[in-house]
Swiss-Prot record:
Motif (Mediates retrograde transport to the ER): 346-350
Record key words, sorted: Cell membrane, Cell projection, Cleavage on pair of basic residues, Cytoplasmic vesicle, Endoplasmic reticulum, Endosome, Lysosome, Membrane, Phosphoprotein, Postsynaptic cell membrane, Receptor, Signal, Synapse, Transmembrane, Transmembrane helix
Physiological role: Multifunctional protein which functions as a renin, prorenin cellular receptor and is involved in the assembly of the lysosomal proton-transporting V-type ATPase (V-ATPase) and the acidification of the endo-lysosomal system. May mediate renin-dependent cellular responses by activating ERK1 and ERK2. By increasing the catalytic efficiency of renin in AGT/angiotensinogen conversion to angiotensin I, may also play a role in the renin-angiotensin system (RAS).
Ranges facing Cytoplasmic side: 324-350
Extracellular face of the membrane: 18-302
One Pfam family from the record: Renin_r
GO term, biological process aspect, one: positive regulation of Wnt signaling pathway
Claim: Nucleotide-binding is one of the keywords in the record: no
Assembly: Interacts with renin. Accessory component of the multisubunit proton-transporting vacuolar (V)-ATPase protein pump. Interacts (via N-terminus) with ATP6AP1 (via N-terminus). Interacts with ATP6V0D1; ATP6V0D1 is a V-ATPase complex subunit and the interaction promotes V-ATPase complex assembly. Interacts with TMEM9; TMEM9 is a V-ATPase assembly regulator and the interaction induces the interaction with ATP6V0D1. Interacts with VMA21 (via N-terminus); VMA21 is a V-ATPase accessory component.
Stated name of the protein: Renin receptor
Site (Cleavage): 276-279
PANTHER family (alphabetical): RENIN RECEPTOR
Length: 350
């Protein structure tokens, strides 16, 4: 019995060990303090609702209040850190919630909502995963972040430039000669470069279209696999990452005039069982529903409406042409036409 209790404890701790944290948020977006767990697949819905967009399914999570519907944030910045369930964030300024059922997610739905509603204003949309060399830039992000390092070779070269963080960060036990350490440091360099490049285009943070930033950091996870989570390198990297995230949150929050939401997701590891289950459903063979009787396809429900509109318009035009032609054919120029009548009167007067 005691063994079952211990196993259940570790199971619950592993399921709820990850965290979803709010680093910065404006007064118009209200996040309540509490220990309410948030499902991992509903994090995009939290980001969408905080920006004022609608979602397909209602979110019955008490952590997010209604807030000011007429004053929404100008930007949402979400940073996901892999390899750690939680970071030693300063208490008081950060609101954290347990994250349950941590599955891979993306903010594509939020990006699509921004594109559909603000297509003419070309907002900034940046989704970046430096360790996987994945980048997605749309709108004004192409011009603002065109000099941003996105490949592993570019990240390595950026670190050894004169104005890089490598010359100012306290590396402690980290080494600049190790590829894993350089990967972690290059992700911190990306955070610094994003805020630095945006500071050169401050007018983009003051327009009316909302912006979206989604960043995935896996350098700490690689350090844990290389040195171990109890190693000095992992502890030093965690402290450096916390300081870098705090500075990045302050910079982005300040650039948007205090009207931005900065969110952090820390995931030790994703629940592969849930991912595998969803994949088996998507990869299931589709049944052949084609009828062997060569039946006609089902027409659109609006077909009858369009058909009646076209039919009666054509009938009305045909009747108008027939009536007009009949009247012209039987018209008496002397009496039915005002042109000839006026001409005859004028002739009589003359």
């Amino acid at each position: 019995m005691a063994v079952l209790v211990v196993l259940l404890f570790f199971l619950v701790a592993g399921a709820l060990g990850n965290e979803f944290s709010i680093l910065r948020s404006p007064g118009s977006v209200v996040f309540r303090n509490g220990n309410w767990p948030i499902p991992g697949d509903r994090i995009p819905d939290v980001a969408a609702l905080s920006m004022g967009f609608s979602v397909k399914e209602d979110l019955s999570w008490p952590g997010l209040a209604v807030g000011n519907l007429f004053h929404r944030p100008r930007a949402t910045i979400m940073v996901m850190v892999k390899g750690v369930d939680k970071l030693a964030l300063p208490a008081g300024s950060v609101i954290s919630y347990p994250l349950e059922n941590a599955v891979p997610f993306s903010l594509d739905s939020v990006a699509n909502s921004i594109h559909s509603l603000f297509s003419e204003e070309t907002p900034v949309v940046l989704q970046l995963a430096p360790s996987e060399e994945r980048v997605y830039m749309v709108g004004k992000a192409n011009s603002v972040f065109e000099d941003l390092s996105v490949t592993l070779r570019q990240l390595r070269n950026r670190l050894f430039q004169e104005n890089s963080l490598l010359n100012s960060l306290p590396l402690n036990s980290l080494s600049r000669n190790n590829e894993v350490d350089l990967l972690f440091l290059s992700e911190l360099q990306v955070l610094h470069d994003i805020s630095s490049l945006l500071s050169r285009h401050k007018h983009l943070a003051k327009d009316h279209s909302p912006d979206l930033y989604s960043l995935e950091l896996a350098g700490l996870d690689e350090l844990g696999k290389r040195y171990g989570e109890d190693s000095e390198q992992f502890r030093d990297a965690s402290k450096i990452l916390v300081d870098a995230l705090q500075k990045f949150a302050d910079d982005m929050y300040s650039l948007y005039g205090g009207n931005a939401v900065v969110e952090l997701v820390t995931v030790k590891s994703f629940d592969t069982s849930l991912v595998r289950k969803s994949r088996t459903i998507l990869e299931a063979k589709q049944e052949n529903t084609q009828s062997p009787y060569n039946l006609a396809y089902k027409y659109n429900l609006e077909y009858s409406v369009v058909f009646n509109l076209v039919l009666w318009i054509m009938i009305g035009l045909a009747l108008a042409v027939i009536i007009t032609s009949y009247n012209i054919w039987n018209m008496d120029p002397g009496y039915d036409s005002i042109i000839y009548r006026m001409t005859n009167q004028k002739i009589r007067i003359d």
